[in-house]
């Protein structure tokens, strides 16, 4: 009898341990992202203050990287706010931002740029479906 009760508790114990490991890893990741965000902010401010050697693409790339880091920190915050759940729309936001960064950084090939823009369009359509799925069900 006692043994069966312990076996019933085992999945809950494993789940709790894994949740603690996940939360610890996410907190560590948030700290690393905050440090990276501070570095990007410093780099951006130095680029803006030292305008003699600034390449506009470098500034744009750093700005988009800032928003990527900021978005991932926001994703971690939302994970804890929403009861240990990652909302899908935040991953789509991160994907759109990453593709924008790729277009800014890698713009030599026009075919690649069009493909990247198509990927952004697909993600925007997916985002609209996610955001308006409840309204679409009522139609």
From Swiss-Prot:
Topology in the lipid bilayer: Multi-pass membrane protein
Name used for this protein in its record: Protein PsiE homolog
Main location: membrane
UniProt xrefs under HAMAP family: PsiE
GO cellular component: plasma membrane
Coiled coil: none
InterPro entries, per the entry: P_starv_induced_PsiE (IPR009315), P_starv_induced_PsiE-like (IPR020948)
One Pfam family this sequence matches: PsiE
One of the GO BP terms on file: cellular response to phosphate starvation
Keyword Cell inner membrane carried by entry: yes
Claim: Lipoprotein is one of the keywords in the record: no
Transmembrane parts of this sequence: 20-40, 60-80, 85-105, 111-131
Keywords: Cell inner membrane, Cell membrane, Membrane, Transmembrane, Transmembrane helix
Family: Belongs to the PsiE family.
Compartments, as annotated in UniProt: Cell inner membrane
Signal peptide: none
